[in-house]
């Protein structure tokens, strides 16, 4: 510690209960200007202890409207997450061969994330099966880890596809390297995100940044992010008929797919880059420090 440090305001940004506790203890032990900020992302009502901890914070923020709705009081501000728009770029901005080129001769409906029912993969498969049968040049690509406890779930999904005679059009890639994800997003003709519940949901931002048309469920931050019919489509979680209708609309209209993809990319550049997230956080830090 130095005299200069004693006059500085230190921001402690907590994201979990244990971090709020650490910050409160630190504030008592270290005699410096410490301001504590908490980000609430949980989409559930907090325990009494957590609510008490939040009441001791200098500021509480959230990442989306859905998470904010569970707080006992309105957060000071909403600061959504962002993505690296240089990493997740549209096809037109990428030169050279992609790792996903083996998929390029067909059209693909993709869904990303660890394979389990919570992600709405069963909804997607049931919605897509008749469309795959009617469009043999389209595939369903499920990108994500299959843990041992989910193997039976996957077997049931494959049996469902086999019963509709489209098993060869349903691909489970398994867990993919992090570096392969940008090219996999670009390889998709349509990206879906159909979670029944979601904390925030970066997958949608990554797909939109990649210039892909997105169908997302009304979960996590997705209703905040997507302007339906302008830069993506929104469906209710678990709504098979609605999801099938949205898929059919995009399968049948290439121009609409391209329109949504272009608008999606612009939405990310305007509002959801990681640089913009950092700028908003720094601005909020400065506002807290000045009070």
Locations of the language-model features?
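Conserved acidic donor-binding segment of nucleotide-sugar-dependent glycosyltransferases
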Residues: 228-229, 233-240, 249-255
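Short alpha-helical donor nucleotide-sugar binding micro-motif in glycosyltransferases
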Residues: 175-176, 183-188
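A conserved, positively charged/aromatic
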Residues: 32-58
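Short hydrophobic beta-strand element within catalytic cores of glycosyltransferases
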Residues: 213-217, 226
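Aromatic "clamp/platform" in nucleotide-sugar-dependent glycosyltransferases that forms part
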Residues: 196
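Conserved donor-binding/catalytic core segment of Leloir-type glycosyltransferases
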Residues: 99-119, 125-129, 141
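Nucleotide-activated donor-binding/catalytic signature segment of Leloir-type glycosyltransferases, i.e.
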Residues: 29, 154-175
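A short helix/loop element that forms part of the nucleotide-sugar donor recognition site in Leloir-type
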Residues: 89-103, 157
């Amino acid at each position: 510690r130095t005299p200069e440090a004693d006059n500085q305001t230190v921001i402690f940004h907590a994201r979990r209960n244990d971090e709020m506790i650490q910050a409160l203890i630190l504030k008592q032990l270290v005699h410096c200007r410490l301001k504590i900020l908490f980000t609430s992302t949980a989409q559930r009502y907090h325990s009494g202890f957590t609510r008490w901890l939040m009441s001791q914070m200098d500021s509480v923020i959230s990442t989306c409207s859905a998470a904010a709705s569970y707080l006992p009081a309105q957060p000071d501000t909403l600061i959504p997450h962002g993505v690296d728009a240089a990493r997740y770029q549209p096809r037109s901005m990428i030169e050279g061969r992609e790792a996903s080129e083996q998929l390029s001769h067909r059209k693909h409906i993709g869904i990303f994330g660890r394979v389990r029912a919570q992600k709405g993969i069963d909804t997607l498969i049931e919605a897509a099966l008749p469309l795959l049968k009617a469009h043999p040049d389209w595939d369903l690509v499920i990108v994500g880890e299959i843990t041992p406890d989910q193997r039976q779930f996957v077997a049931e999904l494959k049996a469902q596809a086999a019963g509709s005679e489209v098993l060869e059009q349903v691909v489970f890639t398994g867990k993919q390297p992090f570096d392969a994800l940008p090219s996999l997003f670009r390889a998709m003709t349509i990206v879906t995100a159909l979670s029944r519940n979601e904390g925030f949901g970066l997958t949608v931002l990554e797909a939109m940044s990649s210039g892909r048309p997105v169908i997302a469920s009304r979960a996590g931050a997705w209703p905040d992010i997507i302007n339906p019919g302008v830069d993506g489509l929104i469906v209710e979680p678990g709504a098979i008929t609605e999801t099938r209708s949205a898929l059919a609309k995009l399968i049948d209209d290439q121009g609409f797919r391209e329109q949504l993809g272009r608008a999606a990319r612009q939405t990310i550049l305007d509002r959801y880059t990681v640089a913009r997230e950092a700028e908003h956080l720094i601005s909020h830090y400065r506002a807290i420090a000045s009070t």
